[in-house]
Amino acid sequence: RSAGVSAVYHFYSEQRRKTFKRWLMDPSYEIKNERLKILLYELKYAGHKVGLHPTYDAWNDSELLKEQKKTLEESLGSKVTYCRQHWLRFSWKDTWLNQARSGLTQDSTLMFNDRSGFRNSCATSWKPWNPKGHKEHQIGCISSVIMDSHLFDYNNFSCCERNEYMRNWIIECKKVHGTCSLLWHPHTLTKDYGWDEDYNMMLEAISDKEL
């Protein structure tokens, strides 16, 4: 927030009994933990948005999405409308339809896993077409253009190269007054990863009004 940038923080809110697969694929924190509730309030009152980070198996299940959304809302104390599917798990046929059925209204799942870019071919938010209902889906979508792993795991950039790479994508979006999402996982800001310097460079580029 000190950089003049607000964000959407997505939280996992699973309440089912853990199976081995869920231990392996999903986060392990408890959204009803009092310390996490305090963090949710702090984010909300600092002007940020809180969204749902559904479980690995929720991408095609509206009831599961609705249940997880409700659990997060109970901890947050207000309505949740944003989401991004875990592991970017997504189906053109089912995911948007089930998100809308669950009461979610904004999704930022659509992106490439291993490279940066506009997967919907343009820097804009939109309501995708529902071929089953012959009308638009009742959910808005924003393409996620950059993910932290694109910069470190899928490319062998130097620090300067990463900075230039990020800035070029941000400039491209700003030039057309577009809309896009940038995905950064909070655990990579720890000393174990040390990606915090690049995260701060990204915030500076976003807030730089001269770009």
Task: Kindly give the residue locations of the regions a language model identified.
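Active-site-adjacent pocket scaffolds in enzyme catalytic domains
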Residues: 1, 17-19, 71-173
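Short, well-structured secondary-structure segments
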Residues: 1-56, 179-183, 190-191
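C-terminal domain-boundary segment and adjacent tail
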Residues: 2, 45, 163-211
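A cross-domain feature marking catalytic cores of carbohydrate-active enzymes
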Residues: 9-13, 52-56, 84-87, 108-110, ...
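Acidic-and-aromatic substrate-binding clefts and catalytic sites of carbohydrate-active enzymes
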Residues: 15-20, 25-34, 55-65, 84-93, ...
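A general structural detector for well-ordered alpha-helical segments in enzyme core domains, enriched
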Residues: 35-39, 64-72, 95, 165, ...
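Short hydrophobic/aromatic-rich motifs at helix boundaries and adjacent loops
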Residues: 40-43, 66-69, 142, 176
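Alpha-helical structural signal in soluble globular domains
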Residues: 42, 46, 71-75, 98-104, ...
